[in-house]
């Protein structure tokens, strides 16, 4: 398994001294007795966009959910190994999962606005986190960052459910930005959107990637190539009982993954020969 930011990679990336935001060390995830993903070790660079690609069932979303402990909410799920965020293993017993989720936000595949006004969707997180500043200012800033302000500034009290699918997804991104995270996780954020809405989300991602660490799971390899700086390729493998589990095959700069990958599996996947 290859990672350009690992200590032993010998990669040109090492000389650039990219700051690491999140590091996994031998991270494995189980659902009951079933091994879902095995021993993933990688370093996610700060203020860059990293894409996770691979066939269905390879563990992309499972690993993504480890980064803000959303797997804790799945009955029977357990994690082995560690996820290091700012020098601390977020799975240590003294770590508050709610604080992890504030600092590491998640945008889901399907837009899921609350059945509240546009304004209250954005203000909800800051309110429950005890935000003491100007809420109006915070709401406007989050909507501007999500490139939605000009479209909704005159209807903030309208239901968020009245927005189009693409607008709802940008609202969900704005809602995440309002809690002032350091990392934004996105699990197939364009899967249910039309091509025009997808393009707007991709343009937004490129803009946000200058200020936030973003990790995106996508089945769309063209999208990964367009928006990401780094790409991790995951695949499945059969254990001795014939049961599939996921693993990371290769992690490198996106240009390298798509143009000259080090692993044959990666080359076959990105060229469309399997998957």
UniProtKB/Swiss-Prot annotation:
Catalytic activity: phosphate(out) + ATP + H2O = ADP + 2 phosphate(in) + H(+)
UniProt subcellular location: Cell inner membrane
CDD domains linked: ABC_PstB_phosphate_transporter (cd03260)
Domain of life: Bacteria
Membrane topology: Peripheral membrane protein
Keywords of this entry: ATP-binding, Cell inner membrane, Cell membrane, Membrane, Nucleotide-binding, Phosphate transport, Translocase, Transport
GO molecular function, one term: ATP binding
Enzymatic class: translocase
Coiled coil: none
Binding annotation for ATP: 54-61
The protein's Enzyme Commission number: 7.3.2.1
GO cellular component entries: plasma membrane
Annotated ABC transporter domain residues: 22-261
GO biological process: phosphate ion transmembrane transport
InterPro entries tied to this protein: AAA+_ATPase (IPR003593), ABC_transporter-like_ATP-bd (IPR003439), ABC_transporter-like_CS (IPR017871), P-loop_NTPase (IPR027417), PstB-like (IPR005670)
Quaternary state and interactors: The complex is composed of two ATP-binding proteins (PstB), two transmembrane proteins (PstC and PstA) and a solute-binding protein (PstS).
Protein family per UniProt: Belongs to the ABC transporter superfamily. Phosphate importer (TC 3.A.1.7) family.
Function recorded in the entry: Part of the ABC transporter complex PstSACB involved in phosphate import. Responsible for energy coupling to the transport system.
Matches recorded under PANTHER family: ABC TRANSPORTER I FAMILY MEMBER 17
Name of protein: Phosphate import ATP-binding protein PstB 1
